[in-house]
Design a protein with these regions (language model features):
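Secretory targeting signals
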Residues: 29-67, 99-163, 207, 214-218
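Terminal transmembrane helical anchor/hairpin motif
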Residues: 34, 38-50, 170-244
Length: 244
């Protein structure tokens, strides 16, 4: 177990030399804009309103894109100058290497979600949202969005470690994120589309009663956990057979 955390520490050290931390604050910062502009005629600003409008931009567009960017950056160093061969020649197992990269991706996404919560609380304070703060709703939304990112992160890691090109996985990820607005309207396909799941998990119940947003959270989590197992096992299998 100690070797696994040492690999994680080395991954963190590699990421500290990049501009990845600027990307971490990107989506929460952009989500501030719709929160600042949200208003309904004759209605007071509520925490549910702020969470709804800020999570649309954050969960529907930027969070899925960030998962792909993080995965591509995590694998970028190994794709250069025979990095995979050098890394796997060390006394470490492929499973530990793969899982350490996955842990780094979901840790970065966790930091993104925490920053989103901070921005949401700050915007609520600035807009003088109706008290008290609904901590249970906000925390369930933020944590649920992070959980819903886990299968997408596993899928993106599987693609990024398999393709040596840095831009190809990103282009694929963006192209599959763009249809989110349409797919989220489908109660049939929306819950099973990994790029939509973070937004579905983050949207407060009762705010968007249409399409896949009608799906109960517990049913969505069953789909998410099932997808996570499939994508993570498949990624490990292909990485285990990867020629270096």
């Amino acid at each position: 177990m100690g070797s696994f955390w040492r690999i994680c520490a080395s991954e963190r050290l590699k990421m500290s030399k990049s501009y990845i931390w600027l990307l971490v604050i990107l989506s929460p910062a952009i989500a501030i804009l719709p929160g600042a502009l949200s208003i309904r005629d004759g209605e007071e600003v509520t925490w549910g309103l702020l969470l709804s409008v800020m999570s649309v931009v954050h969960g529907l567009l930027f969070l899925p894109v960030l998962s792909g960017i993080f995965a591509a950056l995590i694998c970028r160093y190994e794709h250069q100058d025979g990095g995979w061969k050098l890394l796997l020649s060390l006394p470490v197992t492929r499973m530990k290497v793969y899982l350490s990269k996955y842990v780094m991706i979901i840790a970065l996404l966790g930091v993104v979600q925490l920053l989103f919560l901070v921005c949401l609380l700050g915007m609520g304070w600035i807009r003088d949202a109706a008290a008290p703060v609904p901590w249970s709703i906000l925390l369930f939304s933020v944590f649920g969005g992070w959980i819903a990112c886990l299968p997408l992160a596993a899928l993106q890691l599987a693609v990024s470690q398999g393709w040596s090109s840095f831009g190809a996985p990103l282009a694929l990820n963006v192209s599959l994120t763009i249809p989110n607005i349409l797919i989220a309207n489908s109660a049939t396909y929306g819950p099973y589309y990994p790029w939509v799941q973070p937004s579905l998990a983050m949207t407060p119940n009762g705010q968007d009663g249409f399409g896949a947003f009608n799906l109960p959270l517990d049913s969505l989590m069953i789909v998410v956990l099932g997808s996570l197992i499939v994508f993570l096992v498949a990624g490990l299998f292909f990485f285990w057979r990867k020629a270096v």
